Amino acid sequence: MCGIVGVVGNRNATDILMQGLEKLEYRGYDSAGIYVINQPENGRLIKSVGRIADLRAKIGIDVAGSTGIGHTRWATHGQATEENAHPHASATGRLVLVHNGVIENYLQIKENYLAGHNLKGETDTEIAVHLIGQFVTDGLSVLESFKKALHIIEGSYAFALIDSQNPDIIYVAKNKSPLLIGLGEGYNMVCSDAMAMIRETNQFMEIHDKELVVLTKDTAQVSDYDGNPVERQAYTAELDLSDIGKGTYPYYMLKEIDEQPTVMRKLISTYANENGKLTVDPAIVKSVQEADRIYILAAGTSYNAGFASKSMIETLTDTPVELGIASEWGYNMPLLSKKPMFILLSQSGETADSRQVLVKANAMGVPSLTITNVPGSTLSREATYTMLLHAGPEIAVASTKAYTAQIAALAFLSKAVGEANGKKEALEFDLVHELSIVAQSIEASLSEREVIEKKVANLLATSRNAFYIGRGNDYYVAMEASLKLKEISYIQCEGFAAGELKHGTISLIEEGTPVLALISSSETVAAHTRGNIQEVAARGANVLTVVEEGLNKEEDDVVVNQVHPYLSSISMVIPTQLIAYYASLQRGLDVDKPRNLAKAVTVE
């Protein structure tokens, strides 16, 4: 949520800031702004509500400089107005600050330190920059004022600060909110994630919590809040411009849906050698082996991926699996088993709720595994172990390829653990071969997109609500399918276990209600689901069926190629991703940037 970009050095700051903010749009925002300066006390501060294009329209050709900071804001404290948009200036206008996160004690700071200050907006960020500015007015240097403020401020934050009297420096600090340094020749950058800087550099440096960076065009000096130097090595990001472009696609979401066969094959090459032998880190395998219960913690789509994998993990490892919503566990962790193992699923690796659980797990000495798409992310750094999805950047807010990659990664982990345990089911499960078949199944489903588009036009284009139903793993896919549909089409959609219809939900079925039914698994389960279809059809529902090959009938709408039952959640979800995409498209909505949503939820 929100995004920061900053640059100091021999670059056109305005161009870099605007390009960076455009690359951060996927994180979600409702306003944006930049501050650019070239000579002391000659900066320009420009803000707007709405899209980055609205901000660009306000920027004249005379707005230039070699140092600048920019920000996309998602309203938390205060409404989406220009007054509340970032950057914010201190009382004298000397200091300018951008901030991501939530300052928990901002009201106490206002009461204790800022009596008499005329605040223009309603944000916690403005209070932070006024606090730093007050210490400068009291006689401290900007650096010492920044340090003093950091010792007072509580909560999550990523800060980038410019002193207009000395514009060759950007002061940076973070706690519980993502921030990276980008390193160039004669210039340096700061940003919320690497994608916003990849046009300028692929050399990055991590900032850990409660660290401060003094950034100039030639140096990035890292220290703790007391001024003690910290050594930090740079790393090279495995990104290039083609990874973050749409190419010929109208939307990132469609591109990312189409990339899923490639992602499956990439995971095969990552976690298995040329002979098909798995190469999952033995230390991870041993840690899972030693657990008497696996706890999967996640949010949103990642939570659904965990549910879709639960039965497979239990069957292959012979270890019970419990799912937890990270935002609930952070405040209400249940009684754990004697030898727990936490697995945290997060596409971004920055999910604040999951991080709160991880902090508690670390404090209790519980081993943890992060499965994420972003190397160097907070969860990957702080967990005991990490497995990467290698899915490439996922920019559309609605997650698609990360969901299927998470299930595949959990399959590799489960088979590796099961093999180590001598479990028959794991030894007989040829995952490399079966996942190759899944990749082919996905390609077959993608080739049917025109059929799906027409079905959606007839069923969902004008609907206000809809239901997904399924049994077994199809129920878990229904949960993800309903989330995807509501996220980007704004159709009120819920996923239900088909057998629960008669226990309340069927009362909502009326003439014309769309019901989308998922059928895979066994003939017995399929027969029961078809019975539920008859029940809703008898009450006027318009039904669309997605059925696995071998269980299909002539009247079914979408047929999915048959795959191994352990992996059916991957193949069955593909048509539902396309259904959501076309429903959003046909309703004239922005598929990649649904309202009120952010890609990475970095505040609780």
Curated annotation (Swiss-Prot):
Q: Which residues form a coiled coil?
A: none
Q: Which GO terms describe its biological process?
A: carbohydrate metabolic process; fructose 6-phosphate metabolic process; protein N-linked glycosylation; UDP-N-acetylglucosamine metabolic process
Presence of keyword Cell membrane: no
Task: Enumerate the active-site residues.
Answer: 2 (nucleophile), 599 (for fru-6p isomerization activity)
Protein localization: Cytoplasm
Which residues does the UniProt record annotate as the domain SIS?
284-423, 456-594
Main function: Catalyzes the first step in hexosamine metabolism, converting fructose-6P into glucosamine-6P using glutamine as a nitrogen source.
Matches recorded under InterPro entries: GATase_2_dom, GFAT, GFAT_N, GlmS/AgaS_SIS, GlmS/FrlB_SIS, Ntn_hydrolases_N, SIS_dom, SIS_dom_sf
Chief localization: cytoplasm
User: Would you tell me the protein name for this molecule?
Assistant: Glutamine--fructose-6-phosphate aminotransferase [isomerizing]
Spell out the SUPFAM superfamilies in the cross-references.
N-terminal nucleophile aminohydrolases (Ntn hydrolases), SIS domain
Q: How does it assemble?
A: Homodimer.
Q: Name the Gene Ontology molecular function terms of this record.
A: carbohydrate derivative binding; glutamine-fructose-6-phosphate transaminase (isomerizing) activity
Its domain of life? Bacteria
EC number annotated for this UniProt entry: 2.6.1.16
Looking up Pfam families in the UniProt record yields: GATase_6, SIS
Whose protein is this, by species? Answer: Streptococcus mutans serotype c (strain ATCC 700610 / UA159)
Q: Which UniProt keywords apply?
A: Aminotransferase, Cytoplasm, Glutamine amidotransferase, Repeat, Transferase
**Entry GO terms, CC:** cytosol
Location of the Glutamine amidotransferase type-2 domain: 2-218
Catalyzed chemical reaction(s): D-fructose 6-phosphate + L-glutamine = D-glucosamine 6-phosphate + L-glutamate
Entries under NCBIfam families matching the protein: glmS (TIGR01135), PRK00331.1 (NF001484)
